[in-house]
Amino acid sequence: MKRIVILMLALVMVIGLASCGNTNVMTMGTGGTQGTYYGYGGILGNQIKNSAGITVNVVSTDGSKANILGIDAGNYQLATVQSDVMAYAAAGERSFEKEGALDSFRVIGGLYAEAVQLVTMDPSIKSVADLAGKKVSIGAAGSGVYFNAIDILAAAGLTENDIVPQYQSFGDSADALKDKKIDAAFIVAGAPTPAIQELCIAASAYLVPIDGAIADKLMQDSPYYTTYKIPANTYNGQAEDVTTVTVKATLIVSTSASEEAVYNITKAIFDNVDSIKAAHAKGAELSLENATSGMTAPFHKGAAKYFAEKNITVESK
């Protein structure tokens, strides 16, 4: 009888610990291996492990929506997402219309600008308007890239029906461009993006500007867009700056994560900006200001605690 009681108590302790989750090991959803999320996520994971003692298993995923759903399902505890997709999830609209509003994630901080990059090798495509009648990859249906492409087409007076849409991932878009199966592709990622770098070197691809009246209308209709310049020589053969629009790559965390763990993660990242800058080009955009501005969902209380120590107040929940 005594032995049974001891076993039952042990079982209760195990179940209790499992329900709290293992805060020393977390899984981070990122993106495709040819995108910026995956490589940058690896850098963040290493920094978190070295400074906070939390092991982060970085996994390749289908991107922002998959990452948010993964957190909601309990498969991931951390994830990188586009700020606009995060807004859709919080409101239960666009790509999250079917799922409804989700409240299972919180913001840790903004990371860097995710440029909307319109890539082509077709010399007749000089503007968004020139996409009419062309085969264009606009990302997976319902993805963040898809809605970015739809927004930009609309700002140029076009609809999905005015092009020959192809619903492809970063890697598939790059392969299709290289094989001349499509005429252009929308790729949303931090520049330089590995997939685009390869295209510019191997196939003389180039970027089409998204600027002027198109950018103005886009920002008027959707305030999470801002203008952004991709500096000259970011890609092979790019002689001049290219103006486009951007959303923001954001690190989010599950609401199940403790305040202490999230505080330590936030501190591990933003107390070590120089180390992250040295490890990845997009680290140059990492700052307290960038981390706390333009967010479209509430911060985790652990992150808010860290930023409060830096005299920055953010909305938390």
Report each predicted region and the residues it spans.
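Bilobed "Venus flytrap"/periplasmic-binding protein-like clamshell domains
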Residues: N24-S51, T55-V56, A113-D179, S293, ...
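Pocket-flanking alpha-helical
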Residues: G42-N46, V59-K98, L118-K126, G171-A176, ...
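Ligand-binding clefts/hinges and TM-proximal coupling segments of bilobed small-molecule sensing domains
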Residues: K135-D151, Y224-M295
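An extracytoplasmic/periplasmic, membrane-proximal ligand-sensing/linker region
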Residues: Y40, Q168, D172, D179, ...
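Short helix-loop capping/hinge motifs at secondary-structure junctions, enriched
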Residues: D122-A129, A257-E260, T313
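C-terminal motif of bacterial Sec signal peptides marking the signal peptidase cleavage site
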Residues: I15-S19
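Positively charged n-region of N-terminal signal peptides that target proteins for export
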Residues: M1-M8
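Pocket-lining segment of extracytoplasmic ligand-binding domains
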Residues: S83-V85, G92-S95, E160-L251, A257
